[in-house]
Amino acid sequence: MVQQESRLKVADNTGAKELLVIRVMGGSTRRYANIGDVIVATVKDATPGGVVKKGDVVKAVVVRSVKGARRKDGSYIKFDENAAVIIKDDKTPKGTRIFGPVARELREKQFMKIVSLAPEVL
């Protein structure tokens, strides 16, 4: 489960490598984030010369989760890591590339640009 203080891998080319979750968006009592949920996070590790720097506060969407998500047909989708993509305020990614597979649930939550950039949608 992704919650406050969780650390996530960054699955794009913005220059950030790791994020620390500050808040899960969606109300003051919202505790956990799953695939397709927006979070506010800070950059804990970044490569030099990237778009974002260490210490920047960013919005991101969770694209892979170890806990996984239940689908309408009863199946589950789970991943080996928790990963997020840094986004702008209009739900478009800050980076120009997405690394690794993303879940189909992002299409239902209207993150079309992330889905189109991803190399694989599971």
UniProtKB/Swiss-Prot annotation:
<dbReference type="Pfam" id="PF00238">
    <property type="entry name" value="Ribosomal_L14"/>
</dbReference>
<protein>
    <recommendedName>
        <fullName>Large ribosomal subunit protein uL14</fullName>
    </recommendedName>
</protein>
<dbReference type="GO" id="GO:0022625">
    <property type="term" value="C:cytosolic large ribosomal subunit"/>
</dbReference>
<dbReference type="GO" id="GO:0006412">
    <property type="term" value="P:translation"/>
</dbReference>
<comment type="function">
    <text>Binds to 23S rRNA. Forms part of two intersubunit bridges in the 70S ribosome.</text>
</comment>
<dbReference type="InterPro" id="IPR036853">
    <property type="entry name" value="Ribosomal_uL14_sf"/>
</dbReference>
<keyword id="KW-0699">rRNA-binding</keyword>
<dbReference type="GO" id="GO:0003735">
    <property type="term" value="F:structural constituent of ribosome"/>
</dbReference>
<comment type="similarity">
    <text>Belongs to the universal ribosomal protein uL14 family.</text>
</comment>
<keyword id="KW-0687">Ribonucleoprotein</keyword>
<comment type="subunit">
    <text>Part of the 50S ribosomal subunit. Forms a cluster with proteins L3 and L19. In the 70S ribosome, L14 and L19 interact and together make contacts with the 16S rRNA in bridges B5 and B8.</text>
</comment>
<keyword id="KW-0689">Ribosomal protein</keyword>
<dbReference type="InterPro" id="IPR005745">
    <property type="entry name" value="Ribosomal_uL14_bac-type"/>
</dbReference>
<dbReference type="InterPro" id="IPR000218">
    <property type="entry name" value="Ribosomal_uL14"/>
</dbReference>
<keyword id="KW-0694">RNA-binding</keyword>
<dbReference type="GO" id="GO:0070180">
    <property type="term" value="F:large ribosomal subunit rRNA binding"/>
</dbReference>
<dbReference type="InterPro" id="IPR019972">
    <property type="entry name" value="Ribosomal_uL14_CS"/>
</dbReference>
